[in-house]
């Protein structure tokens, strides 16, 4: 059976989007997700992407429901770049029109979004989670109210922090982000037992109080060019530790996100682009 799809990217973090509001794709993906999704996301034998987004009807009075799969078939709670790609898709298909706020249902809860006249997409990412029990992580809360601890990796002792934006994130500060053994550290830390559900891993280099560089190892995907929830988690931790202001530019391999956590309370806001790559038709 042929199905239409569109491929979108947010700072190089790319997704295959299927509108599943009027077909049985949700059931099909749920039943065959592992090999099926890995094949579609394979960059040599499939369409190629970091993940797949299904657009579904919402039962909670939201505009739509977003269901997202990582390239390994796992289902994350939320994805900041993915939700921007979803909004760009809806906007390109003239579904949003004059709406000032677009509520989206996700596995992590209700996410409020908006899009401006320049097609920059702003997302209310909700309040960060810093409780070790709720992230979840075995790291303990430090005096600055951030989960913190050390992890030994061969001859390295890494000082690590944790936060959640509906999904778990480990933050590791480094002096030279290009000088670390990224593949080795990322793959090891993703599966570390300090995080019972595995974790996204972010290596952070502080440029100044308003700018940071982040390199992403995404849970279920490996290296990606950007991670929206990760950028937010990094800003939460850097601002709590006094390393940045409450708003900063987060420079990822795929580009820049603007992240703000006003007064270090309430929701975190993220703003950045999302663009269509191409559309097509595939037998499923």
Curated annotation (Swiss-Prot):
InterPro entries: DAP_epimerase_AS (IPR018510), DAP_epimerase_DapF (IPR001653). The keyword Isomerase applies. Its main location: cytoplasm. Keywords: Amino-acid biosynthesis, Cytoplasm, Isomerase, Lysine biosynthesis. Its EC number is 5.1.1.7. It holds the Pfam family DAP_epimerase. The active site is at 79 (proton donor), 227 (proton acceptor). Pathway: Amino-acid biosynthesis; L-lysine biosynthesis via DAP pathway; DL-2,6-diaminopimelate from LL-2,6-diaminopimelate: step 1/1. GO terms for biological process: lysine biosynthetic process via diaminopimelate. Belongs to the diaminopimelate epimerase family. This is Diaminopimelate epimerase. It comes from Prochlorococcus marinus (strain NATL1A). The lineage of its organism: Bacteria, Bacillati, Cyanobacteriota, Cyanophyceae, Synechococcales. The gene is dapF.
């Amino acid at each position: 059976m042929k199905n239409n799809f569109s491929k979108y990217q947010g700072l190089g973090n790319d997704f295959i989007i299927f509108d599943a509001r009027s077909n049985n794709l949700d059931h099909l993906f749920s039943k065959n997700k592992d090999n099926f999704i890995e094949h579609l996301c394979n960059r040599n034998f499939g369409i190629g992407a970091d993940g797949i987004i299904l657009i579904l009807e919402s039962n909670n009075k939201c505009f739509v429901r977003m269901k997202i799969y990582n390239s390994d078939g796992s289902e994350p709670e939320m994805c900041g770049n993915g939700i921007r790609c979803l909004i760009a898709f809806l906007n390109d298909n003239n579904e949003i029109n004059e709406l000032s706020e677009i509520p989206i249902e996700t596995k992590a809860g209700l996410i409020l979004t908006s899009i401006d006249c320049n097609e920059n997409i702003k997302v209310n990412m909700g309040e960060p989670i810093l409780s070790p029990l709720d992230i979840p992580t075995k790291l303990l809360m430090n005096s600055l109210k951030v989960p913190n601890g050390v992890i030994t990796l061969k001859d390295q002792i890494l000082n690590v922090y944790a936060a959640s934006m509906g999904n778990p994130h480990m933050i590791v500060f480094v002096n030279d982000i290009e000088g670390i053994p990224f593949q080795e550290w990322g793959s090891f830390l993703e599966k570390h037992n300090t995080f019972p559900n595995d974790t996204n891993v972010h290596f952070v280099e502080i440029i100044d109080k308003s700018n940071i560089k982040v390199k992403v190892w995404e849970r279920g995907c490996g290296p990606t060019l950007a991670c929206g929830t990760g950028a937010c988690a990094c800003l939460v931790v850097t601002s709590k530790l006094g390393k940045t202001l409450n708003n900063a530019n987060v420079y990822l391999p795929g580009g820049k996100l603007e992240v703000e956590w006003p007064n270090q309370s309430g929701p975190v806001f993220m703003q950045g682009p999302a663009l269509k790559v191409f559309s097509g038709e595939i037998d499923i």
